[in-house]
Amino acid sequence: MGIKRFIIFLLTASLTITGKVNGQEPGMAKADSGCVQKDLSDVIRGALHKPPKIKKDGAGSLLLLPIIGSNPATGFMVGVGGQYAFKMSGSTLYSAFMGSAQVTTKAQVIFLLKNNIYTRNNKIFFSGDWRYLIYSQPTYGLGTTSPEGGVLDYQYNLLGTETTQDSLTQPMKFNFARFHQLVTFKIKTGFYAGFGYQYDGYYKIVDEKLRLAPGDTLLTSHYLYSQNYGFSTDHYIFSGLTANLIYDTRDNMINPYKGIYAAASWKGGMEFLGNEKTVNYFQFEWRSFHSLSKSNPRHLIALWLIGTFSKEGKLPYMILPATAYDQRSRAARGYTQGRFRGANLVYGEAEYRFPISKCSGVLGGVVFMNATTTDNVAKSLALFESIKPGYGAGLRIMADKSSRTNLAVDVGFGQNSFGFYLAASETF
């Protein structure tokens, strides 16, 4: 019955949102007709009584955002994040680099860089995720019923990072390096196939609550899992080759109004590549965008589904599938990053996107609902047996109309938790 509840939840979210939209549609067509899309720079130039800036089609656009925050694990944090969107010569689709750099008062470093690039005539598609972190992050155990032994106090997170401390969390310090890069080649319109390499390495792991002294013993989920399945407790990696199939008909990668993105990936980590044991696992992702208005395509329903499937005990603990471990670290708004973890994970989301500014289109909004399920074989918890919902809303500010880059400000609520999110571009 678990999988049925999961599907019913997502369908109900989508149909409920769609019903509300259809009730508004007749009034929007007239308001939207004859309008010209504007962005933040147009508004600023208008306020200064300057003419709109003429921008060549495909010209690059840069959006930078300050990052300021504080939490017990990292201390005070400051940095910058953003996105550069552009079109390669001869390409009909936008490409983008997204990244951030942050430092904290506890000598921590966070560096992220993601790339999604289409070459001339969209013949080749590159996608990459590079990261280096000297970091602290709480863990909670495995499965969507974690943690064991009680219920967490109400949690607050900023940009996916926990800002509160709870006695049931299991904080960890580590250095982390990631290099994910794939290249796919166009087989026919919309279809790509290719290969890649994926590296995730955790080093200098400190399990802060772990105590092994006789008479003063506290065993953490990370320690027990690593001991049970033969992994080191202070370092490990996944180093593997990937085979990838992609179907992409989106009209815009940064902020689609229509189309589908579907990806399937097999990942194989062999011992000769440095892994402690051979592991194979499978991942799929589906994103689809369904316009609800002929006169204004910004009225749309967006659907997102992620599934990652591995065999229990084959992947090291911190490399197991977990919430917000997607390329943009955006899944499961309302919960902190890594809140739910397991050998297998399925995540789904439905989001309604709509304009607020009736003519200029500078302001928009979203409402969303999501659901996460993970397993825990050791506790006989199956996938779909426990499902954790989330929901929320957000504001969108059109920062660059040519690439459709939005400044996104969201609030999300989960079970006994809250999150605030600020980002360049849509969540998915």
Name each region found by the language model:
Residues 25-44, 50-51, 138-295, 371-377:
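Transmembrane beta-strand segments of outer-membrane beta-barrel domains in Gram-negative
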Residues 55-63, 70-231, 339, 404-408, ...:
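Gram-negative/organellar outer-membrane beta-barrel architecture
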Residues 60-62, 74-78, 93, 107-111, ...:
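Residues that define the transmembrane beta-barrel architecture of outer-membrane proteins
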Residues 50-60, 88-95, 120-125, 186-190, ...:
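Short loop/turn motifs that connect adjacent beta-strands in outer-membrane beta-barrel proteins
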Residues 231, 241-244, 250-358, 362:
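C-terminal outer-membrane beta-barrel translocator/porin domains of Gram-negative envelope proteins
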Residues 64-66, 97-101, 126-130, 193-195, ...:
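Membrane-embedded beta-strand positions of outer-membrane beta-barrel proteins
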Residues 1-28:
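Bacterial Sec-dependent N-terminal signal peptides
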Residues 353-390:
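C-terminal hydrophobic structural anchor segments
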